């Protein structure tokens, strides 16, 4: 699966703080909107990343949209969540 420049797919190999740092780096590079994607068991980790970002940045971050759904992978349905975050100046 190809990732967009502003999309971060939450994976089990990285911890929550690494994903938080990735989002902050993207914001510091000038990207105003980032999409966090949690797939399957990593849905709760994606929500944890958002909550940690909200704790660190406070009102500097805004949750624009939350989208849930499922996609077919290897003939199985896998749930996902998309969290669209926007940097507020």
From Swiss-Prot:
Record PTM text: Acetylated. Acetylation at Lys-12 decreases DNA-binding affinity.
Residue ranges of the TM segments: none
Location(s) in or outside the cell: Cytoplasm; Chromosome
BP-aspect Gene Ontology terms: chromosome condensation
GO cellular component: chromosome; cytoplasm
Record-level Gene Ontology MF annotations: double-stranded DNA binding; RNA binding
Annotated coiled-coil segments of the chain: none
UniProt-listed Pfam families: Alba
UniProt KW Cytoplasm keyword: yes
SUPFAM superfamilies in alphabetical order: AlbA-like (SSF82704)
Main location: cytoplasm
Keywords from the named record: Acetylation, Chromosome, Cytoplasm, DNA condensation, DNA-binding
Residues the record lists as N6-acetyllysine modifications: 12
Family: Belongs to the histone-like Alba family.
Protein role: Binds double-stranded DNA tightly but without sequence specificity. Involved in DNA compaction.
Name by which UniProt lists this protein: DNA/RNA-binding protein Alba 2
Species assigned in the record: Saccharolobus shibatae (strain ATCC 51178 / DSM 5389 / JCM 8931 / NBRC 15437 / B12) (Sulfolobus shibatae)
Gene: albA2
